[in-house]
Design a protein with these regions (language model features):
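N-terminal secretory signal peptides that target proteins for export/translocation
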Residues: 1-3
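Mixed-charge, low-complexity segments
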Residues: 5-66, 70, 262-369
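Compositionally biased, intrinsically disordered low-complexity regions enriched in proline and serine
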Residues: 27, 68, 79, 99, ...
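Hydrophobic/aromatic-rich core segments of domains that either
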Residues: 30, 35, 154-157, 162-164, ...
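Secondary-structure boundary elements
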Residues: 32-34, 46-50, 55-193
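Hydrophobic transmembrane signal anchors and adjacent membrane-proximal interface regions, especially
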Residues: 44, 50-53, 67-70, 77-79, ...
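Short flexible/disordered coil segments
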Residues: 94-100, 240-252, 305-306, 310-318, ...
Length: 369
């Protein structure tokens, strides 16, 4: 009797373990993510289901649509209602017609690029297909920018060359200035203004490049490591080998805005210490479309601002001049969260990255520039 009970207990445990493993693996699948997205769509569920069924099952456009939907719950957009700007969840508000057009237009542009062999389907989904970058208002932008800028790169066969041409053109014509605007501006408004802060220029440039089939991303540093209280945004390109590419004369990852021109003639020989006008960067992040981390409302309340975004990813290692093996001794309780910080005159030390414990006495602050 006892042996039979023991055997039944063992069988029950094995069955439960197998069920747990199956559930765990299922929760990592695209089908589960699609199911969860439909659940979160609420009253907009029919629109999302219609979009998922729009393209032929198994086709690349069908897979592209699934990619957009499964990661959509992480994204929100601002909507202007009179003089009030409210934030809504894309999964609860976006129309099937909008995302169907977005997928179709992006796919056709990608397939007709002269450099399409440089852009894999995975790369297309991540860096060309998304209908947005951050939380800006949603508008129909892709074909407008395509027709406006396509003539600049009609005969260009290399993605890097197309990136350079568009980058230089927009940098010359879109003026960076400190402006006060009413909330988040959509990219068509930015197009009519042709001016804004560095974030708005990077946002605009990223949209234009994606409309032309260039795998563009918006990278940023939350704060300069040695100047002021602001950060900086710029547009990079992801090459076919997944290396971050920016314009450079010497082969190194160049970040615009890092050199502040001298206002006066400086004789460096008159100074005891090295003098330059370089703005230095500690960490670089990128707005992805993929969900990078789970950030619930409850968890977000206890996190520094930089870590509240579910789709920003640390890409510091993809830039040149990176220091590695930054392990330092520390005397803190093992359960305490640790952050990498930079110092700002007005605010003191502010978090800019996560630090990972090696053990209770050492911490790895991660790659830094």
């Amino acid at each position: 009797m006892f042996k039979k009970m023991k055997r039944n207990v063992i069988i029950t445990i094995i069955v439960l373990v197998l069920i747990s493993l199956l559930l765990h693996f299922y929760m990592q699948t695209d089908s589960y993510r699609i199911y969860m997205a439909l659940c979160e769509a609420k009253e907009n569920k029919k629109q999302i289901k219609d979009a998922l069924c729009f393209f032929e099952r198994g086709s690349e456009r069908w897979k592209a649509m699934r990619y957009l939907v499964m990661h959509m719950p992480s994204h929100t957009s601002y909507v202007n209602k009179g003089m009030v700007q409210t934030e809504i969840r894309d999964i609860e508000a976006i129309s099937s017609n909008y995302i169907e057009k977005n997928v179709n237009e992006a796919y056709v542009i990608w397939k007709n690029c002269l450099w399409k062999h440089e852009v894999s389907f995975e790369k297309f989904c991540k860096y060309i297909l998304p209908y947005k970058v951050d939380r800006e208002p949603i508008v129909e932008w892709r074909m407008y920018f395509y027709h406006k800028y396509k003539h600049l790169i009609d005969s260009v066969a290399k993605e890097e060359e197309a990136y350079r041409i568009i980058y230089k053109y927009i940098k010359k014509n879109f003026k960076v200035k400190h402006t006060k605007s009413f909330g988040e501006l959509d990219v068509l408004t930015l197009d009519s203004i042709q001016g804004g802060n560095c974030r708005e220029r990077a946002l605009y440039m990223t949209y234009v490049m994606r409309a032309l089939g260039i795998a563009a991303v918006m990278d940023f540093t939350p704060f300069w490591a040695n100047q002021g209280v602001n950060g900086h945004f710029w547009t990079s390109m992801v090459r076919s080998d997944n290396i971050t590419y920016t314009i450079s004369d010497n082969g190194e990852a160049y970040i615009d805005g890092t050199c502040e021109p001298y206002k006066y003639v400086v004789n460096k020989n008159e100074y005891l210490y090295h003098v330059d006008s370089l703005k230095r960067i500690a960490k670089v992040y990128r707005y992805s479309y993929d969900k990078v981390r789970d950030v619930s409302v409850e968890v977000a309340q206890n996190l520094p601002d930089i870590f509240r975004c579910a789709y920003s990813v640390d890409v510091t290692p993809q830039y040149r001049n990176v220091t590695k093996n930054n392990i330092i001794p520390i005397e803190r309780k093992c359960e305490d969260p640790l952050y990498v910080c930079t110092y700002q005159q007005q605010y003191g030390w502010r978090p800019i990255g996560r630090a990972n414990r090696v053990d209770c006495g050492h911490v790895d602050v991660g790659p830094m520039i």
